[in-house]
Design a protein with these regions (language model features):
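Active-site neighborhoods of divalent-metal-dependent phosphate/nucleic-acid chemistry enzymes
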Residues: 69-111
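Short amphipathic alpha-helical interaction patches enriched in hydrophobic/aromatic residues
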Residues: 10-12, 46-50, 68, 85
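Alpha-helix N-cap and coil->helix boundary residues
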Residues: 4, 19, 34-37, 52-59, ...
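Amphipathic alpha-helical segments within well-ordered protein domains
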Residues: 43-47, 62-65, 82, 99
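Short, well-structured N-terminal submotif of metal-dependent ribonuclease cores
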Residues: 1-34, 50-56, 127
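Acidic, PIN/NYN-like endoribonuclease modules and their adjacent C-terminal/linker elements
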Residues: 1, 99-127
Length: 127
């Protein structure tokens, strides 16, 4: 299976460069793997560079989870992170993802200085 980089995923969802979007579609057509890091970068790019709102990003992540040609690394972890992200708009998707990665690995609590993140089950505020 091939693997897709962040810019490939961004082109698939934004379609802001139709030529690149078509090439990205063709690249993933037979199946492509998307790492957790690529997904976290995609959420950041969509928020900071494209100015998308929280729920728009959540909907895109949901769409990627259901995309017929994409296999997301640890989709169960991503789904749980997405659930936290939807419930707590002040917490970034990458923070939610870090917590769920730690949970799956059996390494809780997740120590953090982030007030909002520490409100989630499994996270512990250090100060």
């Amino acid at each position: 299976m091939l693997a897709a980089d962040t810019n490939v995923v961004v082109r698939i969802v934004t379609r802001d460069d139709e030529r690149q979007a078509l090439v990205a579609d063709a690249f993933v057509q037979k199946g492509a793997w998307v790492s957790q890091l690529v997904l976290a970068e995609t959420a950041w790019v969509l928020r900071d560079l494209y100015g998308l709102e929280h729920e728009e990003i959540a909907s895109i992540i949901e769409m990627l989870l259901q995309h017929e040609s994409l296999t997301l690394q640890d989709a169960d972890v991503i789904a749980m992170a997405l659930e936290h992200y939807r419930q707590r708009p002040r917490i970034g998707f990458s923070d939610c993802l870090v917590l769920e990665i730690a949970r799956k690995a059996g390494h809780l609590p997740l120590g953090t200085f982030d007030r909002d993140l520490s409100k989630l089950d499994g996270a512990q505020r250090l100060l």
